[in-house]
Amino acid sequence: EDIESRSQVKRTLCGNGQMVWHIWGEGVPIVFLHGGHGDWSHWCRNVEQIAAEGFKVIVADLPGLGASDDPGPPYTAEGIAEIVYYGITSLLPENSEIDLVGFSFGSVIGAVVAEKLDIRLKSFNVVGAAGFGPRERIANSMVKIHKAMSEQERIAAAQNNMRWLMLAHPENVGELATFMQLFNTDRARTLSRPISMTTRLLDALPNILAPVNAVWGELDRTVEGLSLIHISE
């Protein structure tokens, strides 16, 4: 199934270029922001199911990631969020209420967007959120992917990294996940990690007027159980 071919593609301003959005369905607007080194396909198993429930599913390629052009300076959560906010408000009528969902790096950008949306925001929902400040690194277990690698080495590195960082069960590290990871990594220009390591999401929480919902995986290595929840408290 070609999920992308069934979407409507829209473009909004992004630095000196364009930000790319994919849209499925009609109804209540819900906006999804993907994680670092990703694109809209982080949500590929969710978009059509959610659209079928009566939502207008609007999924970003964040600035400097996926098919979107580079954001230009400042390379901060605020600078990127301003572009995303402009895109959302360009795509939707002025009086639209919006549900916003962010994954990992996308939750940090989403927090700043949530502040800007003010009373238009219906809910802010984060999955595997970053933006709580520095956290224990697992870099020693990760393999840096570089141009000198053979294709087999690139595949092995990507699969190792997904097993450590993204997918707790090895059987889920299949051909589709590996292709997505390498394809998105090759296109990534925005350095998401420095932004993810800030406290920008934590700082934004008191300013977000809508209900906030958060979920982390029980086996999520980046948070070591409930450590980020304890920080937020």
Where are the language model's segments positioned?
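An N-terminal hydrophobic leader/cap segment in hydrolases
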Residues: 1-11
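Conserved alpha/beta-hydrolase catalytic His-Asp/Glu region
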Residues: 152-210
